[in-house]
Regions:
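Extreme N-terminal starter segment of soluble prokaryotic enzymes
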Residues: 1-4
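Conserved, mostly hydrophobic/aromatic
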Residues: 17, 78, 125, 139, ...
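Non-catalytic positions within long, well-ordered alpha-helices that form the structural scaffold/packing
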Residues: 18-19, 70-71, 118, 167-168
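Conserved anion-binding
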Residues: 24, 29-162
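C-terminal helical cap(s) of enzyme catalytic domains, especially alpha/beta-barrels
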Residues: 39-48, 91-92, 178-208, 212-215
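Contiguous, function-dense segments enriched for cysteine-driven chemistry
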Residues: 52, 129, 140, 144, ...
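Ligand-binding grooves and catalytic loops that recognize ribose/phosphate and carbohydrate rings
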Residues: 113-124, 171-172, 189, 198-199
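C-terminal active-site rim and adjoining tail of enzyme catalytic domains
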Residues: 151, 155-162, 167-181, 187, ...
């Protein structure tokens, strides 16, 4: 189970994520209560061991600006939220960055988004709440008619208390958390980070064991 902790802001957050066993840490590079300037993000990304992926997260800025921010921040991956097109992803493909595409299931839309990982040239897909970053859960029952394929991460209102159940229902390749491991908005809690990573990885192990038993 791939676990990404998003919205880390300082060295203590980074240390907590690494110690907990997170596979990726996300740095907000555009408007957010968790936003970092590229210099701070670069310094924090440099602290990560090779096995932990540094991800720059952007929302709504032009693709060229997103790429510039990611390179300035020294991250190894770029996650794009918003109305980005295949052409936008193609324009970023030459950069030395792994690409993540974030989308959501809009209950008011008659046409679901493209849910096949790689459809836009991205390596990973993140399926989030329509109001991402606010800790709001969404109806996982929607996945019955629109389920992602490939390497996809579930996000939106996940916490240490509910992530195991969400994994059982959604069966994602990975999970992403931000506000669910905060003591107050924008303030990460090391214990909650530890609890979340452990709960997610233990749930995945239980799922795998059950699948083997039923094979």
């Amino acid at each position: 189970m791939f676990v990404k902790v998003c919205g880390v802001r300082n060295a203590a957050d980074v240390a907590a994520g690494v110690a907990a066993g997170a596979d990726a840490l996300g740095f907000m590079l555009t408007e957010s209560v968790r936003k970092l300037d590229t210099g701070t993000a670069r310094a924090l990304a440099a602290e990560l061991p090779p096995g932990v992926l540094s991800v720059g997260v952007v929302n709504g800025v032009p693709a060229a600006e997103a790429g510039r921010l990611a390179l300035a921040a020294g991250v190894r991956a770029l996650q794009l939220h918003g109305r980005y097109t295949r052409e936008d992803f193609a324009a970023l493909a030459h950069l030395p960055l792994r690409l993540l595409r974030a989308t959501h299931l809009d209950p008011d839309s008659a046409e679901p988004p493209e849910l096949a990982t790689g459809a836009y040239g991205e390596e990973m897909l993140l399926l989030d709440s329509p109001s991402y970053g606010r800790g709001e859960r969404w109806d996982l029952g929607r996945l019955e008619s629109a389920r992602p394929s490939g390497k996809w991460l579930l996000a939106g209102g996940l916490t240490p208390a509910n992530v195991a159940g969400a994994i059982r229902v959604a069966k994602p390749w990975g999970v992403d958390v931000s506000s669910g491991v905060e003591s107050s908005r924008g303030i990460k809690d090391p214990q909650l980070i530890r609890d979340f990573v452990a709960a997610a990885k233990n749930a995945a192990k239980a799922e795998n064991a059950e699948n083997v038993e039923n094979a």
